[in-house]
Amino acid sequence: MSLRHIGLAVLALGCAHPAMGQSPNQGRPLPQGYGSLTQDDLSLRVGDDNLVIRFVPLDPRLMPLLARDAAQSLRFLLDSHKRAIDSVASRAGVATPGIGLVSFFGQRADARFDPQTLTILIRNRVFRPLGVIALSARFNSQQLGVREQASALYLFEEEIPVNDSFLLSYGVLTSEDWERKLPLLDRERARVAARSRTEPIDTGR
């Protein structure tokens, strides 16, 4: 191999993005089982007098940051709906879709919702759902009573940039809170990396 080719190879390695589930500081995958975050720590919420909407990005890079039970619950959710996820992605011609767990909560009687109204804004581009996989029969009715909820998996054309900022919108309701979560995620990555070097995984948790 020529010196020019070696130089190009080194440059390419230096510019490579961290793999899924990697710590930017460590440059290697973070292990599972050391995280302490909950689903609520990763949730974005928007709402009004009719509805509250919760959005949880289901991204492999976030899984090592979650407490064991929370991570296992979300992985089971994805695994049990893998066939439907793959079908939606295949029809859309998308190899690696972004996935979010979306829950609608009724705040009054006969609260109606439109699943297609929810969007995310990534780098000034609006992404509407490629497909919606209902997780409850109530979701298809698009109507909720007080304290009732309906959930679904939302698939998007691009991976959700969980290491950067993005916006969640439902009509005129918007959340920019993900950017404010980034310091928490960075601290948890550092904590997980440190714990993994000094503590064995507690398989009984």
Predicted regions and their residues:
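Conserved functional micro-motifs across diverse proteins
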Residues: 20-205
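Positively charged n-region of N-terminal signal peptides that target proteins for export
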Residues: 1-5
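Bacterial N-terminal signal peptides
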Residues: 6-16
